[in-house]
Amino acid sequence: LRIQYGTSYAYPVSFMGSHVSIAPNHQIFRNTSLKLRGDVAYFGTFGYELDLGKLSAKELDEVREQIRFMKKYRKLIQQGTFYRLKDPFTGNAAAWMVVSDDRRQAIVGYYKMLAHPCTPYTWMKLAGLDEAADYTVRIDDREEMGQFTGAELMRAGLDTTDFSAGEQSREEGRHCTDFWSRLFVVEAK
């Protein structure tokens, strides 16, 4: 996350090599989810550096979904205006987003590094949207989170609270672990 964040100061998203690697990682042996690795890799050239033949059927389905997502949003991600939202060098999260030229569509990547119990509720202010537009926000391009104006999303922010803030969930992907991520798809109505 820090490497990609820092690289974004010198290179556009379309120039950054960003791939889903094997887990545990072969250099530092950290074990992160396929979802997190994909969510980070979207904001670069996107590819895979692992033996697909060693993945489970469930993991292969997830890879197919990641490829579908990237094909659907490639133009936006590669050519949109990039905004840095949370600096991983100064906090426990990294976040960035890309916004289309007409400001009708955006993809937000939010990445929490280490999980802590009883964290406060958090909001993250977005950037580059049309203040007067009405937007629908979906989590991971599936679950609708709500409808908000651009002004709400940029001034009050987007709820980034994880389930360590007192809520409990055993649903896969809904509970917060170390190196946890969430994508938000923001589209004008």
Predicted regions and their residues:
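Conserved, mostly hydrophobic/aromatic
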Residues: 41, 108, 137
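Flexible loop/turn segments at secondary-structure boundaries
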Residues: 24-28, 49-51, 57-59, 115-118, ...
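C-terminal beta-sandwich/jelly-roll accessory domains of carbohydrate-active enzymes
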Residues: 114-189
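Catalytic cores of secreted or luminal carbohydrate-active enzymes
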Residues: 35-86
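Carbohydrate-binding surface patches
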Residues: 88-131
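Glycan-recognition surfaces
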Residues: 1-53
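A generic secondary-structure signal marking the coil-to-beta-strand transition
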Residues: 39, 104-106, 180-182
